[in-house]
Regions:
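N-terminal export and membrane-targeting signals
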Residues: 5-28
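Catalytic cores of secreted/periplasmic lytic hydrolases that degrade extracellular macromolecules
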Residues: 2, 26-27, 32, 39-49, ...
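Intrinsically disordered, low-complexity segments enriched in proline/serine/threonine
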Residues: 12-18, 43-50
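Intrinsically disordered, low-complexity repeat segments enriched in small/polar residues
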Residues: 6-9, 53-58
Length: 250
């Protein structure tokens, strides 16, 4: 029996062909956006090419020069056997007098090592020489600390003269250049070259013949000083310094 009260819903009208095409296009476009959003991320760009530059740095310390030994301690050498920290530490343990130099001890040690390295002179032994010359930088003699004269420059026996330098570096440089003239026969003139820094040594030309004392053992008796025990005094201080690093004299 047919239920007369049941009404049949009318069928949905078919979309026109152009509307169906539009719906498909919108769905596909939306699906495409989802695919792009959910796909694999682009790989990161490659890192930029870099160039590695290797800089050769001279060592802070090195062994004694070839041929240098207790009876022939070389004045010249590419680098010191003790570094600045070792020298300053040793000095603090051993000095018993006021320090009166115009710059702090750490600065003065650095100047000796820098200037020595520039001219190929062993700056740690030059520092030991200055200890002998200045009484551990207390300057008890006629050369005052304000002269920045760490090596008795110009303070010859029988005169009241002495060398005066404008600052500590200049005083150290003059000492190093004078040592090179004593030890190195190639130091023909107080110019650049053969020197590596501008000449500040007013007595450079007075050392003749050049290169006449290549070892510290030859100092004294007219080489730098008239004292016949000058070399032994300098080397005794240096031997003591080397003890901080358990090194022997060479």
């Amino acid at each position: 029996m047919i239920n007369r009260h049941t009404r049949q819903l009318p069928a949905a009208p078919a979309l026109p062909r152009w509307r169906r095409a539009l719906v498909v296009t919108v769905v596909l476009a939306a699906f495409g956006v989802v695919l792009v959003a959910c796909g694999e991320p682009d790989p990161p760009p490659p890192p930029p090419e870099t160039t590695t530059t290797t800089t050769t740095v001279a060592p802070a310390t090195c062994g004694a020069p070839e041929g240098s030994g207790p009876t022939a301690v070389a004045v010249m050498g590419p680098c010191p056997r003790l570094d600045a920290d070792q020298i300053a530490f040793w000095f603090g343990l051993n000095t018993q007098v006021p320090y009166n130099a115009t710059v702090p001890l750490a600065t003065l040690v650095r100047l000796f090592l820098e200037e020595g390295r520039a001219e190929g002179v062993r700056g740690d032994i030059a520092f030991a020489q200055s200890i002998v010359e200045t009484g551990w930088f207390s300057f008890p003699g006629r050369v005052p600390a304000s002269a920045n004269n760490f090596s008795g420059f110009g303070a010859t026996d029988g005169t009241a003269d002495y060398g005066v330098f404008p600052d500590a570096r200049t005083g150290v440089r003059a000492q190093i250049q004078h040592l090179r003239r004593y030890a190195d026969a190639t130091a023909t003139a107080c110019t650049v070259p053969p020197l590596h820094n501008p000449c500040v040594d007013p007595r450079f030309a007075y050392v003749t013949p050049r290169g006449k004392a290549p070892t510290w053992n030859q100092f004294g008796n007219g080489n730098w000083a008239t004292d016949p025990t000058y070399a032994s005094k300098v080397l005794a201080v240096y031997t003591n310094m080397l003890g901080i690093a358990r090194l022997s004299l060479a």
